């Protein structure tokens, strides 16, 4: 399946989440492919959210999908500004 990488985010463990063909591809900090979180549409971009920062929101072709995970997103300094 064809497709291009667009969105990219990291979790608190250093895993990398990248939108691509068939959904969100997950890689370990060492670069090992851990799996794909399937999406019903072409995945375009993504961001962390939710009260505990453990939900991944993915903007697809015509919808936004939310995936609850067992890991939190990596909070970078600019996300904690008030």
Annotate each PLM feature.
Residues 45-82:
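Blade-level signature of beta-propeller repeat domains, shared across WD40, Kelch, NHL, RCC1
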Residues 25-26, 65:
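WD40 beta-propeller blade core
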Residues 27-32, 70-72:
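Short loop/turn segments that connect beta-strands within beta-propeller blades
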Residues 1-21, 40-54, 61:
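Beta-rich, blade/repeat-based domains predominating
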């Amino acid at each position: 399946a064809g497709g291009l990488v667009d969105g990219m985010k990291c979790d608190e463990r250093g895993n990398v989440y990248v939108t691509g063909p068939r959904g969100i591809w997950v890689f370990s900090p060492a670069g090992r492919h851990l799996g794909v979180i399937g999406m019903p549409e072409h995945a375009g971009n993504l961001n962390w959210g939710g009260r505990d920062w453990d939900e991944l929101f993915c903007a697809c072709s015509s919808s936004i999908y939310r995936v609850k995970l067992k890991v939190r997103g990596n909070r970078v300094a600019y996300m904690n500004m008030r």
